[in-house]
Design a protein with these regions (language model features):
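Non-catalytic all-alpha helical scaffold/repeat segments
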Residues: 1-230
Length: 230
């Protein structure tokens, strides 16, 4: 319990400055101990009511250290992992750093668990976090573009439409984000496989038929700047 409290304080930027990464220690314990101890640690993380990204850091740490353990936990400790996943995505900001952590878990998760995580992403990609889907998708196609193929059609369609909607709102001045989302779309198109890239372009075209946004022009402009664009 004290270990979790230290990790929570560190993730929230409070408490004594630790030289060690406490969330890494928590994920180490979960990965390297028996199921019962690991289960207790996850329970403690779930019970530590907090609005920082402790859950996300822990689940990302597990996925990087032991893919098999991650998927075993998602199957055998489903209720706990469901809570951990829900909390991890819900408390994630729309920063690229948090999106990268989510993408790391997706990359290492089996098909069912990956779809569950992306389902949470699309559920939480709203209001001030509207750009979350765009940033997670960008991170996935950068590191593991074929992973998109293992997602359900519903998850893929939701991610793509939310990505384009967020960029449209930004280009119309309705939202602020430190990242140019038209460039994010251009990067997704360039780095995705053909099927995903085509789907993004089709959705972009459909969206723009209903609006007078300069979004398409900005995306095309950014596409020409991409290294691998032909």
């Amino acid at each position: 319990k004290q270990t979790i409290q230290s990790a929570q304080n560190q993730a929230g930027g409070t408490g004594v400055q630790q030289t060690q990464d406490m969330t890494s220690i928590v994920s180490d314990i979960i990965v390297n101990t028996n199921t019962e101890t690991g289960s207790k640690m996850i329970e403690e993380v779930n019970n530590s009511s907090t609005e920082n990204n402790l859950s996300l850091q822990v689940i990302s740490g597990i996925s990087e250290k032991d893919t098999t353990k991650l998927n075993t936990l998602s199957e055998n400790n489903k209720e706990q992992m469901d809570t951990l996943t829900e909390s991890a995505v819900k408390n994630a900001g729309a920063s690229q750093e948090d999106a990268d952590l989510i993408a790391t878990v997706v990359a290492n998760a089996n098909e069912d668990f990956a779809n569950q995580i992306i389902g949470e992403v699309t559920k939480n990609s709203t209001e001030e976090n509207q750009a979350l889907s765009a940033k997670v998708m960008k991170s996935i196609v950068e590191s593991n573009p074929d992973k998109i193929d293992s997602l359900s059609d519903e998850n893929k369609d939701n991610m793509i439409s939310q990505t384009i909607e967020a960029a449209k709102n930004q280009s119309e001045g309705n939202t602020n984000d430190d990242v140019d989302l038209t460039n994010t779309i251009a990067e997704i198109i360039t780095k995705s496989n053909d099927e995903t890239a085509t789907k993004v372009l089709e959705t972009l075209t459909d969206t723009l038929e209903e609006s007078e946004s300069k979004l398409a022009l900005n995306v095309v402009s950014n596409l020409t700047k991409q290294e691998n664009y032909e």
